[in-house]
A protein has these predicted regions:
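Active-site-proximal specificity loops/subdomain of glycosyltransferases
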Residues: 21-56
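Short, P/G- and charge-enriched loop/turn segments at secondary-structure junctions
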Residues: 38-41, 104-109
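A glycosyltransferase accessory/donor-loop signature
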Residues: 2-3, 7-8, 15-17, 22-29, ...
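GT-A fold catalytic core of metal-dependent nucleotide-sugar glycosyltransferases
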Residues: 48-97, 121, 128
C-alpha cells in the first residue's frame, strides 16, 4: 500500500479522537506467526484483515477498513446502528469493475461480494468470528475468507459507509468514501468525486 494513502486514512479517523492500529504484515509474522504468502495482484493486507477478531481476543467490536478510505464523519456512528451480527458490511451490488487494473498495477477483478470486506465491523464475541483463527487465516482459500463462507449472520449498513468513488453517484454527503481504483495522488484520479476531502488531509 502507499504510505501517503495510509496516512490520509489514519488522519481522517484520528481527528475524531479514535485510535488506529495498522495491520503490518512483518509485525504479524514476527509476533503472531502469520505466514501467508501474498498472491500476485494482492496487497499485504488482503488476508491480514481477517485476523482482527483473533488480535482482539475475540472480544468487543472492531472496525476494519482499507487504507484508501477517507472518513468524512465520525466512524463511531456505526456503533449506534450495528446490530449483533457476526460481521456488518456494505453489501455492494456492483457487477463489474471500472478498470482492469488499479493503482500499483494491482489486478482489478470482479467476484461475488467484491468490496464487502473492504469495510467490516466485526462482532468479535460472536461464535462465527471464532472460525477466524490464525491457522484459518493462514491456510483457508481466498473465497472462504472474502466471500464470507465462514459466516451466515452478515449484517448490512447502507452505501454511505463505503461509498465507492467512480461507481456510485447518488450520495452527496457519505460518511466514508473509498477510492478503490486509485486515490487522488494519481493523475488519473485527481479529479474524482470527493478528491478535495482526500487532499485536505494530505
Amino acid at each position: 500500500t502507499q504510505p501517503e494513502n495510509t496516512d490520509v486514512c489514519v488522519r481522517s479517523i484520528e481527528r475524531f479522537g479514535h485510535q488506529v492500529t495498522l495491520l503490518d504484515k512483518k509485525d504479524l509474522e514476527r509476533d503472531y506467526g502469520y505466514n501467508r504468502e501474498v498472491e500476485d495482484g494482492s496487497t499485504e493486507f488482503t488476508y491480514t484483515r481477517f485476523l482482527v477478531p483473533y488480535l482482539c481476543g475475540y472480544k468487543g467490536r472492531a472496525l476494519f477498513c482499507d487504507s484508501d478510505f477517507v472518513w468524512r464523519k465520525d466512524p463511531a456512528i456505526l456503533d449506534t446502528i450495528v446490530q449483533d451480527a457476526s460481521i456488518t458490511v456494505v453489501k455492494h451490488l456492483v457487477k463489474q469493475v471500472r478498470e482492469d487494473h488499479k493503482f500499483l498495477a494491482h489486478k482489478n477483478e470482479w467476484y461475488p461480494r467484491k468490496w464487502w470486506s473492504s469495510m467490516m465491523v466485526f462482532n468479535c464475541d460472536h461464535v462465527e468470528c471464532s472460525a477466524l483463527t490464525l491457522d484459518a487465516v493462514n491456510t483457508q482459500t481466498p473465497q472462504w475468507l472474502h466471500r464470507f463462507e465462514w459466516a451466515t449472520d452478515i449484517g448490512r449498513v447502507d452505501e454511505s459507509y463505503n461509498y465507492l468513488v467512480g461507481y456510485y453517484n447518488f450520495l452527496k454527503d457519505p460518511v466514508a468514501v473509498h477510492f478503490t481504483d486509485g486515490t487522488p495522488i494519481y493523475t488519473d484520479y485527481a479529479q474524482d468525486e470527493f478528491a478535495e476531502d482526500y487532499n485536505d488531509l494530505r
